[in-house]
Amino acid sequence: VMETKHTLLEALGIELKECSKERCVAVMPVDERTRQPFGYLHGGASVALAETVASIGAYQHIDPKEQACFGLEINANHIKSVKDGTVKAVATPLHVGKSTMVFQIDIRDEQDSLICTSRCTMAVISRPSS
């Protein structure tokens, strides 16, 4: 179980729904926490959601006692705007290697329309021995 208290996940209202080695799913509200000044979902909130599901997805492939993973690169194409409701992100691994992983993330609105597509590269590092 991952602790999310006092994290960006808590601040943005991101909730993890499912996660396995094959896919990771989370939802995020479109509300005062995630909108930009014109009332639409902020692109940065979408990117934060995308990196969240990629990071948690990558975590499924490592030994957390021996390794850690961090976002190395992320890109996003914002396809459609959203004013309210909830968006859902699904991350699937495209590459799972020893030192890097690449995830494809699609974010959809409540009508299942694609609103953002993203690709995130994760770095895998060894934890220092204590």
Language-model segments: residues:
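Terminal targeting signals and extreme-terminal segments of soluble enzymes
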Residues: 1-130
